[in-house]
Structure formats: structure tokens, C-alpha cells
């Protein structure tokens, strides 16, 4: 695992705080499976689901329980939460922001996934960001490469009235856009040859695809098949895909469907299958 950021450890030590660890079982499947088999010292936030679902869901645990699992730093799907609140209060707060007020809801926000968490922060209202941030002195999440970063929290004013966790229509649309590149990269992960400049760095991969999608959507592309084809082209093309996409004859001609696929075929350079 990667080291915790020094700013996080210094803040915890200077203020005599303890940490809780929030884990995404879908991103850390071996750990999620172990927790589902031996949950002592940890809380499944999917408590009402079958064991298989709990294994893939979010888990909240003490620092000691995390250490017993070998968690001593940052990795994808692992979050360190510094708070003065009790574990029970943290659990309640996380459940509220993951599923809303409806305890029977099957629509969950993946707060333990750093990608999803940052996407949500980008679409929440100011009041929502402040209400979510209230319990945390610090929140350390891992980026797409597993490196630790501190979440930008909002503590400028106190929330005096309840704040809805619901997303409006425009927020939902913005969230879909914010998560689109990750979703398409995931779908194509075993199907697309990867350019050598993108191997070993998921952040570069995401940046290249997201920039290509932004230009394509600005040019009028909205069909998911077309956007998937352009994502595959970006993954084959590499880090210079954002500068090359505007020059593509296929985009200039507004090609779509099979014509776009045929035009993009062979456009990319040195590609290697990889993850």
C-alpha cells in the first residue's frame, strides 16, 4: 500500500484523533470477502443484504481492525476518516449520504470509491457539501492509482437546518457526465488495446478519455455507442489523444455508428493490450 499523506497523519497526531477506515468491497474484493466471513470489529453498511452483497459493499471499521487485515496505508477503495464522532454516528452519517432517508432504497452512492466521491462533490450544492463535510476533520481517499489525497472539505458555515441528500435532475445529469469516462474505460478494459503511454497510470488514462469525450460531446456527440468508440480510440492513441481528436476527419464529418467505427479503425498509433 501507499503511505498516508503526511498532512493527514500530522493532523491526526496533533489533535489526538483516531481514524476510522471505510473500504469499498468491490474494489478490494479479497478484503471484502474476509470481512463478510469474519465481520467482528467492522460494520457492513450493506447489513440488510445477503453475504455475497455485503462482501462487495462498503465496510466501516476501526484502525485496529484495519491493521489486522493488513491495511496500513492508501489503496484504491480505502479511505481514512478523521473524526471526533463515534463510530455509530459516522455509520449513520455515511448511510444517509449513501442511500438517502429511505432505508429500503436500492440506489446507493459509492462514497468509498474515490472516483465516485469526487464526482459527487462536483455536483452537490454548497449546502450539501457543507452538510456532508460536517463530521470530518479530514478524509483521505485514494486516486485511480492508489495514491492518497485529502478530500477538499467545506466547513465555512454551520448547517442549521436539514439538508436533502437528493440530487435534482440537473445534478443527476452532471453526475452521469462526471462518471462517464470511468464507466466507459471499465467497459472496455479487456477489449481495447492500450497505448504504451497510458500503461501503468489510470489517472493519465482517465484524463485522456475525459478530454476526448468533452470535445466530442461539445461537437454534438451523445450516442453511447459513438462515445464508446471514441473512448476506445483515445485508449489506443495515448496521452496526445486530446490534441489529435479535433483533427480527426471522422469528427469533422460528424460520422456516426459503423461509419465512425470504420473511420477510427487504424487511426491510433503504438498500442499494447494492458491494464
Which positions does each model-derived feature cover?
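A contiguous, surface-oriented mixed alpha/beta subdomain in the mid-to-C-terminal portion of proteins
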Residues: 2-47, 51-63, 83-88, 95-97, ...
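Short, glycine-/Ser/Thr-/acidic-enriched flexible segments
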Residues: 66
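Short acidic/His/Gly/Ser-rich catalytic and metal-binding motifs that mark active-site loops
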Residues: 70-71
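A surface-exposed, charged beta-strand/loop segment in the N-terminal or early-internal portion
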Residues: 74
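Aromatic-anchored, charged helix-turn/loop surface patch used as a conserved interaction hotspot
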Residues: 77-82
Amino acid at each position: 500500500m501507499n503511505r498516508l499523506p503526511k498532512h493527514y497523519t500530522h493532523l491526526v497526531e496533533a489533535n489526538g484523533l483516531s481514524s476510522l477506515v471505510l473500504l469499498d468491497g468491490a474494489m478490494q474484493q479479497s478484503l471484502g470477502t474476509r470481512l463478510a466471513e469474519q465481520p467482528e470489529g467492522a460494520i457492513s453498511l450493506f447489513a440488510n443484504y445477503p453475504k455475497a452483497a455485503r462482501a462487495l459493499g462498503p465496510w466501516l471499521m476501526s484502525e485496529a481492525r484495519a491493521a489486522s487485515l493488513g491495511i496500513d496505508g492508501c489503496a484504491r477503495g480505502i479511505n481514512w476518516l478523521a473524526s471526533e464522532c463515534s463510530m455509530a454516528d459516522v455509520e449513520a452519517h455515511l448511510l444517509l449520504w449513501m442511500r438517502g432517508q429511505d432505508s429500503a432504497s436500492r440506489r446507493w452512492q459509492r462514497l468509498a470509491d474515490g472516483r465516485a466521491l469526487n464526482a459527487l462533490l462536483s455536483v452537490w450544492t454548497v449546502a450539501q457539501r457543507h452538510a456532508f463535510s460536517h463530521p470530518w476533520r479530514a478524509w483521505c481517499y485514494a486516486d485511480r492509482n492508489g495514491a492518497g489525497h485529502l478530500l477538499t472539505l467545506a466547513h465555512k458555515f454551520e448547517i442549521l437546518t436539514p439538508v436533502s441528500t437528493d440530487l435534482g435532475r440537473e445534478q443527476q445529469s452532471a453526475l452521469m457526465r462526471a462518471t462517464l469516462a470511468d464507466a466507459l474505460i471499465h467497459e472496455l478494459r479487456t477489449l481495447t488495446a492500450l497505448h504504451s503511454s497510458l500503461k501503468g497510470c489510470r489517472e493519465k488514462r482517465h484524463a485522456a478519455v475525459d478530454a476526448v469525450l468533452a470535445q466530442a460531446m461539445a461537437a454534438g456527440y451523445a450516442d453511447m455507442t459513438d462515445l464508446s468508440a471514441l473512448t476506445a480510440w483515445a485508449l489506443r492513441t495515448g496521452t496526445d489523444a486530446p490534441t489529435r481528436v479535433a483533427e480527426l476527419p471522422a469528427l469533422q464529418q460528424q460520422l456516426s455508428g459503423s461509419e465512425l467505427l470504420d473511420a477510427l479503425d487504424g487511426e491510433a498509433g503504438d498500442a499494447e493490450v494492458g491494464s
